[in-house]
């Protein structure tokens, strides 16, 4: 079974480690962040 994509709007101090952990476990990510 494929994993559900997870979306993040802004990574910041909390979202960055969460996104890295999800990527490590094979979740496809959709990320929007303004630099």
From Swiss-Prot:
The UniProt record lists the keyword Cell division: no
Reactions catalysed according to its record: 3-hydroxy-2-methylpropanoate + NAD(+) = 2-methyl-3-oxopropanoate + NADH + H(+)
Chain sites annotated for binding NAD(+): 4-33
GO molecular function: 3-hydroxyisobutyrate dehydrogenase activity; NADP binding
Record PTM N6-acetyllysine, positions in chain: 24
Pathway membership: Amino-acid degradation; L-valine degradation
A cellular component annotation (GO) from this entry: mitochondrion
Keyword list, A-Z: Acetylation, Branched-chain amino acid catabolism, Mitochondrion, NAD, Oxidoreductase
GO biological process, one term: valine catabolic process
N6-succinyllysine: residues bearing it: 24
Compartment(s): Mitochondrion
Location, primary (coarse class): mitochondrion
EC number: 1.1.1.31
Family indicated by similarity: Belongs to the HIBADH-related family. 3-hydroxyisobutyrate dehydrogenase subfamily.
Cross-referenced PANTHER family: 3-HYDROXYISOBUTYRATE DEHYDROGENASE, MITOCHONDRIAL, 3-HYDROXYISOBUTYRATE DEHYDROGENASE-RELATED
Record text on subunit structure and interactions: Homodimer.
Record-given protein name: 3-hydroxyisobutyrate dehydrogenase
Organism for this UniProt entry: Oryctolagus cuniculus
């Amino acid at each position: 079974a494929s994993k559900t994509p997870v979306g993040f709007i802004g990574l910041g101090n909390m979202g960055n480690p969460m996104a890295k952990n999800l990527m490590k476990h094979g979740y496809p990510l959709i990320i929007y962040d303004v630099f």
